[in-house]
A protein has these predicted regions:
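Ribosome-associated RNA-binding proteins
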Residues: 1-151
């Protein structure tokens, strides 16, 4: 998921972001729209909110492999992923501040460095099982006392 903020009105920027997410994921991204207008956030119902892609099966595993082995190590001052991103339903969410850490992105064509949110939805129904699964997939978590914080 990539939120566009004030750039959501510029069709060229939206198209560039769709191309970037498509390159990163290997699957066509879709535009997300606001469901209702909120004046405090200056949003209008039906306006572009961002871009998302949902990966399953082989494409998901290929993405996780590139994320863990290539993209995350390229993040400047990266110490590991926080374990605070787990919810009570066995899902894990985290953000990346720069989408250019993925090798598929041509740095010369990027108009602006953007962040993205990544959510991993699992069939596990608790934090511990999901944590064990992601550790088995070599996700680099911060090495504080993880076992205490998972309870």
């Amino acid at each position: 998921n990539m939120g566009l903020g004030p750039d959501s009105n510029d069709k060229k920027i939206v198209q560039n972001c769709i191309e970037d997410i498509t390159l990163i994921s290997g699957q066509k991204a879709v535009i997300t729209k606001f469901k209702k207008s909120i004046s405090n956030f200056k949003t209008r119902k039906g306006a572009t909110a961002g871009i998302k892609v949902t990966l399953r099966n082989n494409k998901m595993y290929e993405f996780i492999d590139r994320l863990v082995n290539i993209a995350l190590p390229r993040i400047k001052d990266f110490e590991g992923l926080s374990i605070k991103g787990f919810d009570n339903f066995g899902n894990y969410s985290f953000g990346i501040k720069e989408h250019i850490v993925f090798p598929e992105i041509n740095f010369d064509k990027v108009d602006r460095i953007r962040g993205m949110d990544i959510t991993l939805v699992t069939n596990n129904r608790n934090k511990k099982a999901t944590f064990a699964l992601l550790e088995a997939l070599n996700f680099p978590f911060i090495k504080k006392d993880n076992k205490k914080e998972m309870n």
